[in-house]
Amino acid sequence: IYSKEEFNGIGHGGTEQYGAFSYKPGFAINPLKFVNGIAKYALSKKLKIFEHTKVDKIDKENSSYILRTKEGSIRSKKIVVATNGFYQEGLIPQMDGRVLPVISNIIVTRKLNEDELNAHNFKTFSPIANTKNLLYYYRKLPDNRILFGTRGDLTGSDQSNLAMSKKMEKFLKNIFPKWSN
């Protein structure tokens, strides 16, 4: 747990913080880079990758799972269901009715120079989230851009995305007023 002063001392000087707590270990992940890394590793081991292959059924036999598709079956000792909230009901009964899609909206600033980052004492690469009803999360990217996100609306339409983008820009400027340009 950090006081406001301690939080500022580790490299975050936005206007809305009153302190913080930190998860250890905690990190941010780029899902595309993660899955590309897994694919690269699998290919280096001469494994086959079946993209865009719908699993129709999962059966358990002894200590293995059998994933059944129209094209064939795959046997595995372990499986990971990574759906991003778009789960196929009936595939794993324990998950039915428990997974909801969540739309997230993200904006990214231009590359900020050191003076701009220092204006808000933004030094940390740790991901930061607030605890308000409309949660915001943000982090510094390796090239000094700030990724700023929040939950999206329920429709995900182009019109609502544009409105949400403008709203997010306003929130970002409120938290970091010295970046208002």
Regions found by a protein language model. Give the residues of each.
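Dinucleotide-binding Rossmann-like beta1-alpha1 core, especially the glycine-rich loop
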Residues: I1-E5
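Flexible hinge/switch segments at interdomain interfaces of large molecular machines
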Residues: E6-T15
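A short alpha-helix capping/helix-coil boundary motif
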Residues: G14-G19, L147-G149
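Helical element adjacent to the flavin cofactor pocket in flavoenzyme catalytic cores
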Residues: Y18-K77
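Active-site substrate-recognition segment that forms the wall
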Residues: V55-K57, S63-L67, G72-D115, A119-N181
